[in-house]
């Protein structure tokens, strides 16, 4: 993938993607970030954008494939608002809707391998508004305050905020919430990629152990693992994603 103009793969509705990003916080297309050879937004927008007009073709992620519910809608760059008006609210790279679940997706490409993460969580997240069975997520929130450098590769604070946004959406919609962490492992990510990939996966496992069993279900999957699930016409799209973005 080379820099310059934003890349839109065949079958990805460019006008719709541009419209969505034009409304979103940061507008990565207008800012030029989308055209970067290492753009995370370009990977997410192309990977999920193909399903905007054909959501039923979107496969569920391997860790939650047992949901076996048909996908009814796919959105990209979607804001999930907290139960208050002011302040910042989480933006997820994609949201997948079924008749029973709302599945928020946080996609990562090079970010986990670019410097250590320091967690910061405002006092606003202490409000008792998240509903039942959120103890694990609240425990992670508190843990990150006492150990803000617990994770080097994983942006755990961002995931906590996303989970709280999904909990709020679940309270509104009545759908069961799932947060999927979809990560790439680009071979040019750093000087010792295999070592970094292993460390990243271990951090994911540690995080998962703390938040598992809660109302917002957490699952993690590699981009390559998800692309391997594409079937029929989508297999050509999966091939194009792999060849263009090497996730």
What is each of the regions a protein language model found here?
Residues 94, 108-119:
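A short, conserved, highly charged catalytic patch centered on acidic carboxylates
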Residues 115-117, 163, 189-200:
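A short acidic (Asp/Glu
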Residues 114-179:
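Acidic, metal/cofactor-coordinating or nucleic-acid-engaging core segments within structured domains
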Residues 70-99:
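Active-site metal-binding core of divalent-cation-utilizing nuclease and nuclease-like domains
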Residues 1-77, 81:
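Nuclease-adjacent, charged terminal/linker segments that flank catalytic cores
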Residues 79-85, 101, 108-112, 166, ...:
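Short, solvent-exposed loop/turn segments at secondary-structure junctions
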Residues 95-104, 167-172:
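Active-site beta-strand-loop-beta-strand hairpin of nuclease catalytic cores
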Residues 184, 193-247:
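Polybasic (Lys/Arg-rich)
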């Amino acid at each position: 993938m080379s820099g310059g103009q934003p890349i839109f793969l065949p079958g990805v509705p460019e006008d719709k993607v541009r419209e969505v990003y034009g409304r979103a916080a940061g507008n990565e297309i207008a800012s030029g970030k989308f055209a970067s050879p290492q753009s995370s937004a370009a990977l997410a927008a192309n990977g999920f954008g193909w399903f905007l007009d054909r959501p039923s073709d979107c496969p569920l992620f391997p860790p939650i494939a047992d949901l076996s519910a048909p996908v009814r809608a796919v959105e990209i760059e979607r804001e999930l608002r907290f139960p208050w008006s002011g302040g910042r609210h989480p933006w997820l790279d994609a949201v997948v809707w079924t008749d029973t679940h709302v599945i928020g997706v946080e996609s990562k490409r090079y970010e986990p391998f670019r410097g250590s993460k320091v967690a910061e969580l405002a006092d606003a997240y202490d409000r008792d508004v998240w509903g039942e069975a959120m103890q694990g997520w609240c425990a992670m929130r508190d843990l990150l305050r006492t150990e803000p450098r617990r994770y080097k590769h994983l942006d755990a604070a961002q995931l906590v905020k996303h989970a709280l946004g999904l909990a709020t959406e679940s309270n509104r919609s009545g759908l069961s919430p799932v947060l999927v962490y979809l990560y790439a492992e680009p071979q040019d990510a750093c000087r010792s990629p295999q070592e970094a990939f292993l460390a990243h996966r271990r951090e994911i496992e540690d995080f998962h152990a703390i938040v598992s069993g809660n109302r917002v279900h957490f699952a993690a999957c590699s981009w390559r693992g998800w692309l391997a699930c594409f079937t029929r016409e989508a297999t050509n799209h999966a091939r194009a994603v792999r060849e263009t973005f090497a996730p």
